[in-house]
Curated annotation (Swiss-Prot):
Keywords associated with the record: Cytoplasm, Endonuclease, Hydrolase, Manganese, Metal-binding, Nuclease
Required co-factors: Mn(2+); Mg(2+)
Annotated Pfam families: RNase_HII
Organism annotation: Streptococcus pyogenes serotype M6 (strain ATCC BAA-946 / MGAS10394)
E.C. no: 3.1.26.4
Family indicated by similarity: Belongs to the RNase HII family.
Catalytic activity: Endonucleolytic cleavage to 5'-phosphomonoester
Presence of keyword Transcription: no
The protein's name: Ribonuclease HII
Gene Ontology MF terms: manganese ion binding; RNA binding; RNA-DNA hybrid ribonuclease activity
GO cellular component: cytoplasm; ribonuclease H2 complex
């Protein structure tokens, strides 16, 4: 009696190599259900192999530093440079050596539905996490570039007192005035897993803040646009005026501050 399709599917779930002899054995099984299960498992393995290769490539900076003797590499990234409202948020994350988290990438490349899952995975596996938040008032005072630096420095400071302290910093497109060895990486959130981890922590943290602001200041769509200048946000500005979290140094908010006809 031939093996049931259900049993074959269960056997295939345990297969992790495309060279497994089970594939060759099942290739001669004419049942449509078996062939569908066979192709499905092969495709899943190919997807897993591609993901493993991608994650391995994103560890290249970290692996080079491990070879030089560095043990605790912190990735640093920020979210919120461009919005018209809300803070700029930076995160500093130290992952265990050679740590790979499936799906971890530049937060802009991760589907929103998966943000929370990957964020939780980073929180569970990270050796240390620091978060720096600079509000809109300080952004207006010092400019967004300097505010981003301050947020990053605050994120590093938040690691003080935690068990693991960084001996090297990988930073997304920024150099910081701090006595820790560091490297600035252009598009670092897409090229370093440590920076990608910081990217998703900063992203989810800021999105949660903006969702809270949406409840306090309805009508601007903050929960959906995170403070960026979308059509809904601009319509809200026109209808309801400027809120306490708007950046008055950013246009069109800046011009509205000088226009006495605005609400």
């Amino acid at each position: 009696m031939s093996t049931s399709i259900k049993a074959i599917k269960e056997s295939l779930e345990a297969v992790t190599s495309l060279l497994d002899p089970l594939f060759q054995e099942l290739a001669t099984d004419a049942r449509l259900g078996v062939q569908k299960a066979l192709k499905s498992r092969q495709k899943a393995i190919q997807t897993d192999l591609a993901e493993e290769e991608r994650l391995e490539a994103m560890l290249s900076y970290e692996k080079a530093l491990y070879k030089k003797g560095y043990q605790a590499i912190a990735g640093i990234d920020e979210v919120g440079r461009g919005p018209l409202a809300g803070p700029v948020v930076a995160a500093c994350v130290i992952l265990p050596k050679y740590c790979k988290i499936k799906g971890l990438n530049d937060s802009k490349k991760i589907p929103k539905a998966k943000h929370e899952t990957i964020y939780q995975a980073v929180k569970e596996q990270a050796l240390a996490i620091g978060i720096g938040i600079i509000d809109n008032q300080l952004i207006d005072e010092v400019n967004i570039y300097e505010a981003t630096k301050l947020a990053m420095l605050e994120a590093i400071k938040q690691l003080e007192g935690q068990l693991t302290q960084p001996d090297y910093l990988l930073i997304d497109a920024m150099t910081l005035d701090i006595a820790i060895s560091q490297q600035s990486i252009l598009k670092g959130d897409a090229n370093s897993l440590s920076i990608a981890a910081a990217s998703i922590v900063a992203k989810v943290t800021r999105d949660q803040m903006m969702a809270n602001y949406d409840r306090i200041f309805p009508g601007y769509g903050f929960a959906k646009n995170a403070g960026y200048g979308t059509k809904e946000h601009l319509q809200g500005l026109k209808a309801y005026g400027i809120t306490p979290i708007h950046r008055k140094s950013f246009e069109p908010v800046k011009s509205m501050c000088c226009d006495s006809t605005n609400p």
